[in-house]
Amino acid sequence: MALYCIGDIQGCHDAFERLLHRVDFSASRDTLYILGDLVNRGPESDKVLRTCMAAGDSMRALLGNHDLHLLAAAQGVRRSSRRDTLARVLDAPDRDQLLDWLRHQPLARSHRMAHGEELLMVHAGVLPQWSSQEVMALAGEVHSVLRSKQLPDFLQAMYGNQPDRWSPDLQGWERLRVIVNALTRLRFCTAQGVMDFDSTESAEQAAPGLMPWFDVPGRATASATIAFGHWSTLGHISRPDLVALDTGCVWGGCLSMMRFGDHLADRELIQVDCPQAQAPG
């Protein structure tokens, strides 16, 4: 059995298939965690979703901002932009099955290794105040609403940059919006955990007072290894507490997968080149 994590696929099904073939992935033997943004900007989002659905529990996805955007567009609460490539899902004969599968995916996952090490997985980031247990619990609050009859109302209320910081006293849509923004959109924040959504540059280009979320001193998840995607200008990072796997497949970069051994320190990076589906900007 092999354990893998893969970065943002974003509808690039051909690259996804080539990477699965490269590692000889077996649904009966291996486990693949998909770090969000399965869809959008690439040409074949529908095929990506079908491949993941067909694999059952061997492919375990979590939701990114583009996946939530697809759900919002499908509910009619958000219009597709000129850069979106969601029509193949929205017009698919199995649209309802694809969307139902997607809405049942969580915003965070945790994998406990045989020796007790924890691999925590999110699409974008976590706030410095949150422990691993809190990340999973807060993600679960959103997961419950996504599967409920409140889905259209939640998707309507999900958009916005405020509140820009966490408080355990937050309630209702504001509470869920902060959770969603941290887990699916976060790149930079202050040392106090105030989120910034204007900067999308690499970590070295942070504005004064801002830092990558994973470099905040005293981060409560520091004892876990966190795998994430979302940040293509960051590129691949591998350090004891961190695995960054968005390497810009949709922009003509590569699709990246990490294979873990018996310990989280045992890692092998596997990549395939991607044709450019869209230009950045």
Curated annotation (Swiss-Prot):
- Presence of the UniProt keyword Hydrolase in the record: yes
EC number(s) stated in the UniProt entry for this protein: 3.6.1.41
Q: Which SUPFAM superfamilies match?
A: Metallo-dependent phosphatases (SSF56300)
In terms of Pfam families, this protein maps to:
Metallophos (PF00149)
The main enzyme category here is: hydrolase
Kindly give the InterPro entries that the UniProt entry links to this protein: ApaH, Calcineurin-like_PHP_ApaH, Metallo-depent_PP-like
Q: Which reaction does it catalyse?
A: P(1),P(4)-bis(5'-adenosyl) tetraphosphate + H2O = 2 ADP + 2 H(+)
Q: Could you list this entry's UniProt keywords, alphabetically sorted.
A: Hydrolase
GO terms, molecular function: bis(5'-nucleosyl)-tetraphosphatase (symmetrical) activity
Q: Which family does the entry's similarity section mention?
A: Belongs to the Ap4A hydrolase family.
Biological role: Hydrolyzes diadenosine 5',5'''-P1,P4-tetraphosphate to yield ADP.
Its recorded name reads Bis(5'-nucleosyl)-tetraphosphatase, symmetrical
